[in-house]
């Protein structure tokens, strides 16, 4: 833990309060260039997306960004109806401007999952599969349970939540801890230079929050990946947490 520097309460509150603004600025700066399309999800979790038979299912992708998961998924499974939301209005505009946007298949909307009721927007628990990919890590721990309950409220009984996110012990967490820059909120949560939050999940925490929100565990695993950072000419060994829960 050498070099670790904790933020003052003032800055912790400020970063938490300005999270939405920080992400919207992120999309103003990076537009659609930052995240790569995610082509692995349908391969690793095909049965949750109605594959291989291309069954007509209803999906909700929360924290969808500019659609890096939505459009690759729709390409391999055109029978999906995909609701997708993000709290950055700019990100949602990019989803709508995408060349593959199809208003009969893709339904983007602005929503802060920590406080805006998804049930009010969707009207009923109509979701077969909800995807939360690198979004819950942007939310402070005290808001996790409330947010996950919000997600649970729109999933059909027997439907699934598919999760992948940062894991405790990951290379990026070690970097925060040794950088010397003041970035720590608590041992699991850090602030990036652009003001966005990054929570590194412990298995026991996410398992407890999901259980309390009415989910039964299907799988929860650590996955190791080597990620290329071409700009910095780096190969990073990353550890993510990946899981599936069933709405009881
Ligand atoms: C790391 S990006 C992941 C984007 C996308 N899921 C993907 O896998 O490429 C995190 C996204 O979550 C969104 N986000 C963060 N907190 C949120 C919240 N409270 N409600 C809705 N979206 C949120 C951010 O705006 C950002 O687009």
Curated annotation (Swiss-Prot):
Record-level Gene Ontology MF annotations: tRNA (cytidine-3-)-methyltransferase activity
Reactions that this protein is recorded to catalyse: cytidine(32) in tRNA(Ser) + S-adenosyl-L-methionine = N(3)-methylcytidine(32) in tRNA(Ser) + S-adenosyl-L-homocysteine + H(+)
Subcellular location: Cytoplasm; Nucleus
GO cellular component, one term: nucleus
Annotated EC: 2.1.1.-
Methyltransferase listed as a keyword: yes
Keywords from the UniProt entry: Cytoplasm, Methyltransferase, Nucleus, Transferase, tRNA processing
Keyword Membrane: no
CDD domains: AdoMet_MTases
Residue positions binding S-adenosyl-L-methionine: 23, 27, 63, 86, 112, 133
Disruption phenotype: Cells lacking trm141 show abolished N(3)-methylcytidine modification in tRNA(Ser). Cells lacking trm140 and trm141 show abolished N(3)-methylcytidine modification in tRNAs (tRNA(Ser) and tRNA(Thr)).
Biological processes annotated in GO: tRNA C3-cytosine methylation
Function: S-adenosyl-L-methionine-dependent methyltransferase that mediates N(3)-methylcytidine modification of residue 32 of the tRNA anticodon loop of tRNA(Ser). N(3)-methylcytidine methylation by trm141 requires the formation of N(6)-dimethylallyladenosine(37) (i6A37) by tit1 as prerequisite. Does not catalyze N(3)-methylcytidine modification of tRNA(Thr).
Family of the protein in this entry: Belongs to the methyltransferase superfamily. METL family.
Name of the molecule in the record: tRNA N(3)-methylcytidine methyltransferase trm141
């Amino acid at each position: 833990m050498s070099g670790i520097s904790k933020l003052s309460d003032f800055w912790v509150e400020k970063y938490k309060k300005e999270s939405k603004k920080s992400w919207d600025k992120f999309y103003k700066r990076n537009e659609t260039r930052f995240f790569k399309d995610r082509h692995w999800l349908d391969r690793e979790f095909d049965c949750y997306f109605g594959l291989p038979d291309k069954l007509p299912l209803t999906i909700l992708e929360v924290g969808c960004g500019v659609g890096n998961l939505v459009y690759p998924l729709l390409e391999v499974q055109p029978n999906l109806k995909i609701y997708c939301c993000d709290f950055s209005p700019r990100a949602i505009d990019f989803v709508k401007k995408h060349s593959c946007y199809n208003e009969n298949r893709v339904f983007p909307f602005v929503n802060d999952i920590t406080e805006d009721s998804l049930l009010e927007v969707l009207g009923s628990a109509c979701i077969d599969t909800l995807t939360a990919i690198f979004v819950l890590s942007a939310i402070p721990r005290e808001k996790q349970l409330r947010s996950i309950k919000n997600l649970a409220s729109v999933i059909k009984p027997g439907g699934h939540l598919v999760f992948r996110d940062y894991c405790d012990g990951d290379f990026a967490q070690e970097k925060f801890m040794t950088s010397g820059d003041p970035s720590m909120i608590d041992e699991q949560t850090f602030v990036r230079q652009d003001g966005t939050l990054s929570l590194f999940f412990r298995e026991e925490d996410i398992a407890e929050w999901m259980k309390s929100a009415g989910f039964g565990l299907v799988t929860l695993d650590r996955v190791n990946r080597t990620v290329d950072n071409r700009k910095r000419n780096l190969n990073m060994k990353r550890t993510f947490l990946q899981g599936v829960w069933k709405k009881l």
